[in-house]
């Protein structure tokens, strides 16, 4: 049996904007190789074979990395379950049913899921676990996210990730308010989440703790999409050989 030191990745969504960036960034990793791609159009000038359907692939790999759309989920899960392969999900906008399917499938194969593959965002997310406990009583919490005008889901998966982290780490029940309109007064136990779409903004997230006489802002700005590509490639390398279960950026950063 051959032992491969390289991490061989099958990239789903390889012809998309992020897929192209991941392919470019992979050349800077000595231990990673993209050996095949999957995309709705198999026409490309990439250095590896591209298949329109993942089940058509005859190329062996160690990890399947998905940067496509939620509609691809069922075929990816079917393929990875059959091949016993780790699945790295970088797509956002999943329905509750799809999230339940991911959770259930992780009992049989290793699945890595993160709403944002940036290491910086995930460090901030980790900090929020402690900060929220100390500030929630005396500070109003608002989250503002900004993205390019081509992003279809809102609020962003990252904004929800940050909000969920705050909500899960305070004893009181917090409600999400998406945008604000009308004349109702802000209640105490809520997190305001606001989405802005315009131009070519890569990704901007601002968590605001507004108190009496002071305001704390924790902000992350993605300057280039390469930050997401690098995180996705590192996550793929991390997942090689992992046992079944759910994994996220915290697992990787703390390993």
Curated annotation (Swiss-Prot):
GO terms for molecular function: 4-hydroxy-tetrahydrodipicolinate reductase; NAD binding; NADP binding; oxidoreductase activity, acting on CH or CH2 groups, NAD or NADP as acceptor. One of its GO terms (cellular component) is cytosol. Its EC number is 1.17.1.8. Belongs to the DapB family. Pathway: Amino-acid biosynthesis; L-lysine biosynthesis via DAP pathway; (S)-tetrahydrodipicolinate from L-aspartate: step 4/4. Its main location: cytoplasm. Catalyzes the conversion of 4-hydroxy-tetrahydrodipicolinate (HTPA) to tetrahydrodipicolinate. The lineage of its organism: Bacteria, Bacillati, Bacillota, Clostridia, Eubacteriales. The active site is at 147 (proton donor/acceptor), 151 (proton donor). InterPro entries: DapB_C (IPR022663), DapB_N (IPR000846), DapB_N_CS (IPR022664), DHDPR_bac (IPR023940), NAD(P)-bd_dom_sf (IPR036291). GO terms for biological process: diaminopimelate biosynthetic process; lysine biosynthetic process via diaminopimelate. This is 4-hydroxy-tetrahydrodipicolinate reductase. Disulfide bonds: none annotated. The keyword Transmembrane does not apply. NAD(+) binds at residues 13-18, 90-92, 114-117. (S)-2,3,4,5-tetrahydrodipicolinate binds at residues 148, 157-158. HAMAP family: DapB (MF_00102). It catalyses: (S)-2,3,4,5-tetrahydrodipicolinate + NAD(+) + H2O = (2S,4S)-4-hydroxy-2,3,4,5-tetrahydrodipicolinate + NADH + H(+); (S)-2,3,4,5-tetrahydrodipicolinate + NADP(+) + H2O = (2S,4S)-4-hydroxy-2,3,4,5-tetrahydrodipicolinate + NADPH + H(+). Keywords: Amino-acid biosynthesis, Cytoplasm, Diaminopimelate biosynthesis, Lysine biosynthesis, NAD, NADP, Oxidoreductase.
């Amino acid at each position: 049996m051959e032992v491969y030191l390289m991490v061989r990745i099958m990239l789903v969504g390889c012809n998309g904007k992020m897929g192209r960036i991941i392919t470019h960034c992979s050349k800077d990793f000595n231990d990673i190789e993209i050996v095949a791609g999957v995309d709705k159009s198999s026409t490309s000038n990439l250095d590896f074979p591209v298949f329109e359907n993942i089940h058509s692939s005859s190329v062996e790999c160690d990890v399947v990395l998905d940067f496509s759309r939620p509609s691809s989920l069922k075929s990816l899960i079917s393929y990875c379950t059959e091949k016993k392969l780790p699945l790295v999900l970088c797509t956002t906008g999943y329905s509750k049913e799809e999230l339940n399917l991911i959770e259930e499938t992780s009992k049989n194969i290793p699945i890595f899921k993160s709403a944002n593959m940036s290491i910086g965002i995930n460090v901030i997310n980790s900090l929020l676990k402690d900060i929220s406990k100390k500030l929630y009583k005396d500070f109003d919490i608002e989250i503002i996210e900004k993205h390019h005008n081509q992003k279809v889901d809102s609020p962003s998966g990252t904004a929800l990730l940050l909000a969920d982290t705050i909500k899960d780490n305070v004893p009181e029940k917090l409600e999400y308010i998406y945008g604000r309109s009308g004349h109702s007064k802000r209640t105490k136990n809520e997190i305001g989440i606001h989405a802005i779409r315009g131009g070519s903004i890569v990704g901007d997230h601002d968590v605001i703790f507004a108190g009496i006489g002071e305001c704390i802002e924790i902000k992350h700005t993605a300057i280039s999409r390469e930050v997401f590509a690098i995180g996705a490639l590192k996550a793929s390398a991390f997942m090689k050989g992992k046992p079944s279960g759910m994994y996220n950026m915290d697992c990787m950063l703390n390993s």
